[in-house]
Structure formats: C-alpha cells, structure tokens
C-alpha cells in the first residue's frame, strides 16, 4: 500500500470533553506495547512509538528533553497535550536558546522526571497545574480553559508499569533507541520512586462499547 511508517499513540483523556472511560487500563497498554514490538520484528514498515526505550523502560519524551511542541500560534509548549507556554517562536532569541534557557520548560522536565517515568498529565495533573501557575504560564488553548480542565482530570494509569517492561525484539530498533531515543540521563538524575503515586489501581469505568477486534498479525 506504499505505507512507509505508522505512529502509535495511547489516548490521553484531556480537554473540554476528555472521555476518561476511553483510557486504556495498564493491561491494555501492555498489550499495545507487545503488539508494536512484535510488528517491528515481523513487518517491513517503520513503527514509531513515544513511550519506551529499547529495553522497554517507560519514558516521556518531553521530560527527557528529547522533544517539545510548537502550537499553531507559535507557542512553545512542553508537549502537544500540555497547552501552556511562556515562550514563543516569535521571541527574538534563537529557538535553541529558548529551549535551553526557558525556566518553565526546565522546571517541567525536572518535575515530571522526579515523580514518574510515565505521563504527568495522567498521573499527576495536580503537579502540572501548580507548575504552570507558579511560572505564570499562558493558557495557549483557544477556549482559555486549560487550568480548569486540569483541575477536573481524574487519576489515570500511564505507560509507567514497573515489572511489565517489554524489550524490543528487533535489534535495529534496540540499537537505534540506545543512541537516539532514551532518557538521556533524566531519570537517573531526577527520578525518586518514593515520589511516584501508583495510579495503576485507580478505578476506570470503561465505556460500554463492543469488544475490540484483535488486529491480525
């Protein structure tokens, strides 16, 4: 079909109508990870994910400093689903300098890495709210309701699921991630397991939808 790559994301319930019942359980997230790893070893297509290193350890690309997000209006945000910013591409400083000197982005990376190897939006929206408020970060949404939406979020499990790591089978992916997609020392430097709030047992009322169909392998 001339498809060169596919990108797998796990749903993050956020926004004006977050639909938390659609959030995946820890078990479902492990199955998604297993599927991606298996397909990488069997199919002639590049499959991209954003949640694990080559050994299967969970990570957040924004917390590691691997990537941040630029909104349609030019706001420099920590992540596509974290719509707060103090800087813009329209600032006079070069983009590289903005990324390196932003106190908001640096504090975000450290705060996220200190508390979880997963998604701070799902696990600790309260910390994110306090962080943005402390820095006076702008709400970059058109609806101007991001702060309130964070307050309304329920605790949800994310990709950090200790004891259920799934290592890459494909040596090419494992090698590539070793050099180009890892935690860059962020968790070694900052993560403290005693700070982590285990959200895996959080009650999840999933929607009454037909049973999901298994993707043919």
Language-model features, listed with the residues they occupy:
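Short alpha-helical interface elements
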Residues: 22-23, 28-31, 57-65, 73, ...
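Flexible mid-to-C-terminal extensions adjoining Fe-S/redox cofactors in radical SAM and related proteins
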Residues: 81-217
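Radical SAM enzyme [4Fe-4S]-AdoMet core and its adjacent flexible, acidic
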Residues: 1-59, 63, 72, 77, ...
